[in-house]
Amino acid sequence: MSEEAEQQQAAEYIAYLYDQASALRQYIDTLQKNLAEVLESLEAVRASKSAVDEIGKENQEYLLFGDRKGNIVFKVNSVDKNKVLIHLGLNYYAEVDPQAAKKILDDREQQLAEVSKNIQGELSKSIDAYNQIAEILSQVQGKKGE
């Protein structure tokens, strides 16, 4: 193989590695966003479980947020301690006793923790692959400079 052909092949391989690194970077960004969403959902489930635990306490005043941003908050003195509404998915809710709600929330927490673990594993593998490609590209760049 001629030197020119070898240089052409090397250039194509470098371009291929660069494309792979770019694709991995996008994939890593997507995984990080997905992980952040899952962790946010996990925290919301834990907060909901804590709220269910608070229902059983006597003589408590509750704050009910009118929206997600807290633009309006209602003080509530009386809450039915025997029933809660729990979101089942899509636009479905069920009225259940607090213990059933805790069971549903425990299951949801376990599912989200498993999803988080899987995403973190995939993220770790992707970052390792990206770093390996970046190292190769860095070495190639260093050899070009010599």
From Swiss-Prot:
Could you give a single Gene Ontology term from the biological process aspect?
A: protein folding
Supply the alphabetized keyword list: Chaperone, Cytoplasm
A Pfam family reported for this protein in Swiss-Prot or TrEMBL: Prefoldin
Domain of life here? Archaea
Which compartments does it reside in? Cytoplasm
Main subcellular localisation: cytoplasm
Q: Which GO terms describe its cellular component?
A: cytoplasm; prefoldin complex
Record GO terms (molecular function) = unfolded protein binding
Q: Which InterPro entries match?
A: PFD_alpha_archaea, Prefoldin, Prefoldin_subunit_alpha
Q: Which family does it belong to?
A: Belongs to the prefoldin subunit alpha family.
| Oligomeric form and interacting partners | Heterohexamer of two alpha and four beta subunits.
Protein purpose: Molecular chaperone capable of stabilizing a range of proteins. Seems to fulfill an ATP-independent, HSP70-like function in archaeal de novo protein folding.
Q: What is this protein called?
A: Prefoldin subunit alpha
